[in-house]
Curated annotation (Swiss-Prot):
Species the sequence originates in: Aotus trivirgatus (Three-striped night monkey)
Enzyme Commission number(s): 3.1.27.-
Active site positions: H38, H145
Record-given protein name: Ribonuclease K6
SMART domains: RNAse_Pc (SM00092)
Protein family: Belongs to the pancreatic ribonuclease family.
Lineage of the species this protein comes from: Eukaryota, Metazoa, Chordata, Craniata, Vertebrata
């Protein structure tokens, strides 16, 4: 019995590496998944917008921020000076101007009945950018992660 616990722990750790909680859906590129999660040109109702994201992940995402701008404008931030990301990588870029955004926070419910509150904001943002994958728009770099809101 004592041997079983370490073995179970090892299996769980390895499973987490294979199937991370925030895995990108297989048929999407990192940039497309970023667009689905974080780009909405106009203000939105959080319950409706988050249901689209939660349907991919099959759980209630605790928090999410939607930038009210175009993918093209957010991708243009990737052309600005690189800065250090929260994870220590150097592929982040900060917007020069604040944008309107909506912060959605889980207030109650279990998937698929997730309920969110909404907070309108006007702030700067930092995105992580990578070279595009084959089916991404043909920019030099594309946003793949919303690293921070300032």
């Amino acid at each position: 019995m004592v041997l079983c616990f370490p073995l179970l722990l090892l299996v769980l750790v390895l499973w987490g590496q294979v199937c991370p909680l925030h895995a990108i859906p297989k048929h999407l590129t990192k940039a497309h998944w970023f667009e689905i999660q974080h780009i909405r040109p106009s203000p939105l109702q959080c319950n409706r917008a988050m249901s689209g994201i939660n349907n991919y992940t099959q759980h209630c995402k605790p928090q999410n921020t939607f930038l009210h701008d175009s993918f093209q404008n957010v991708a243009a931030v990737c052309d600005l000076l690189s800065i250090t990301c929260k994870n220590g990588w150097h592929n982040c870029h900060q917007s020069l101007k604040p944008v309107n955004m909506t912060d959605c926070r889980l207030t109650s419910g279990k998937y698929p009945q997730c309920r969110y509150s909404a907070a309108a904001q006007y702030k700067l943002f930092i995105v992580a950018c990578d070279p595009p994958q084959k089916s991404d728009p043909p920019y030099k770099l594309v946003p793949v992660h919303l690293d921070s809101i300032l």
